[in-house]
């Protein structure tokens, strides 16, 4: 079902289910023979959500070779390594920020992110998580049931990012006068282009000098290329649906002419360094994801680390 302006979701439907899919990939990466990451909360969270397709994938009952369309450029087999190196990128970002003295972090569209529970945060650290109310409530309750305890002062902010989240964040105790480490992981593609710009504007307005931002950006592409990407994704997920997958990924994202993230942030006073997914995979000794001449795929995603200097 296509997105609407005021749509909502839980972790089994729409955009929320993509968070469960990513957590499933993290669980598989964690259980690998030589794991690049250790997220012990990923698998129990996926099991608790209860989407059969993702549970079978995590347990190995789903054979990805039977599911994947190798010509589409979107394969389940590629996701554990891709999500592992993505996770390491954002983990390292937070570690670098705290070593620099930052004591306030904001995780935008936090989904099933368990960093507040699994990273070694310094004393005096406050972590804010922002997401849909149903998503926040589910994760908080499930992790409490697992006996998990946050390793920082965790403050959840149950608000849609299309609403007045800056006020909700401030009401939760956010200090705009202190440097902040922000992450927007797997978020921009699910925002309209103008909403992406507005999000970056709001982050900047709330950020003191020395604040840091890490984000995942989708390269801009002409409409024709976007349509090809959507068709390739539909081709891939058609095979998945034969095995119980119920999402239409092609309907979840937003197309349109997007600002170049690094240039947009530069105009706002941020200095950015970008790394492509292919480089992250190579740096971590993981198998490459082939580029697709007809479309943008995971291989083309860019990860930016930015510092506010203004």
UniProtKB/Swiss-Prot annotation:
<dbReference type="GO" id="GO:0032259">
    <property type="term" value="P:methylation"/>
</dbReference>
<keyword id="KW-0808">Transferase</keyword>
<comment type="similarity">
    <text>Belongs to the UPF0677 family.</text>
</comment>
<feature type="binding site">
    <location>
        <position position="131"/>
    </location>
    <ligand>
        <name>S-adenosyl-L-methionine</name>
    </ligand>
</feature>
<keyword id="KW-0949">S-adenosyl-L-methionine</keyword>
<dbReference type="GO" id="GO:0008168">
    <property type="term" value="F:methyltransferase activity"/>
</dbReference>
<dbReference type="InterPro" id="IPR011610">
    <property type="entry name" value="SAM_mthyl_Trfase_ML2640-like"/>
</dbReference>
<dbReference type="Pfam" id="PF04072">
    <property type="entry name" value="LCM"/>
</dbReference>
<dbReference type="InterPro" id="IPR007213">
    <property type="entry name" value="Ppm1/Ppm2/Tcmp"/>
</dbReference>
<keyword id="KW-0489">Methyltransferase</keyword>
<comment type="function">
    <text>Exhibits S-adenosyl-L-methionine-dependent methyltransferase activity.</text>
</comment>
<dbReference type="InterPro" id="IPR029063">
    <property type="entry name" value="SAM-dependent_MTases_sf"/>
</dbReference>
<protein>
    <recommendedName>
        <fullName>Putative S-adenosyl-L-methionine-dependent methyltransferase MMAR_3534</fullName>
        <ecNumber>2.1.1.-</ecNumber>
    </recommendedName>
</protein>
<feature type="binding site">
    <location>
        <begin position="160"/>
        <end position="161"/>
    </location>
    <ligand>
        <name>S-adenosyl-L-methionine</name>
    </ligand>
</feature>
């Amino acid at each position: 079902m296509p997105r609407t302006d005021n749509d909502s979701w839980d972790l089994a439907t729409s955009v929320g289910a993509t968070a469960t899919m990513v957590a499933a990939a993290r669980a598989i990466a964690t259980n690998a023979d030589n794991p690049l990451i250790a997220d012990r909360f990923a698998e129990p969270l996926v099991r608790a959500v209860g989407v059969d397709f993702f549970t079978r994938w995590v347990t190995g009952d789903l054979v990805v070779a039977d599911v994947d369309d190798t010509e589409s450029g979107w394969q389940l087999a590629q996701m554990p390594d891709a999500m592992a190196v993505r996770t390491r990128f954002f983990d390292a970002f937070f570690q670098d920020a705290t070593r620099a003295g930052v004591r306030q972090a904001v995780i935008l569209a936090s989904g099933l992110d368990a960093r507040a529970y699994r990273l070694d945060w310094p004393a005096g650290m406050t972590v804010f998580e922002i997401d849909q109310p149903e998503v926040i409530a589910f994760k908080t309750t499930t992790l409490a049931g697992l006996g998990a305890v946050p390793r920082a002062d965790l403050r959840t902010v149950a608000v849609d990012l299309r609403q007045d989240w800056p006020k909700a964040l401030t009401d939760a105790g956010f200090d705009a006068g202190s440097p902040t480490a922000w992450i927007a992981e797997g978020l921009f593609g699910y925002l309209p282009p103008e909403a992406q710009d507005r999000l970056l504007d709001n982050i900047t307005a709330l950020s003191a000098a020395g604040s840091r931002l890490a984000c995942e950006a989708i390269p801009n592409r002409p409409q024709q290329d976007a349509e090809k990407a959507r068709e390739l994704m539909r081709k891939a997920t058609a095979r998945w649906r034969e095995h119980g997958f119920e999402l239409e990924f092609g309907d979840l994202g937003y197309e349109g002419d997007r600002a170049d993230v690094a240039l947009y942030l530069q105009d706002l006073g941020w200095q950015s360094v970008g790394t492509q997914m292919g480089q992250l995979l190579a740096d971590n000794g993981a198998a490459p994801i082939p580029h697709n001449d007809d479309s943008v795929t995971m291989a083309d995603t860019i990860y930016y680390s930015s510092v506010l200097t203004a």
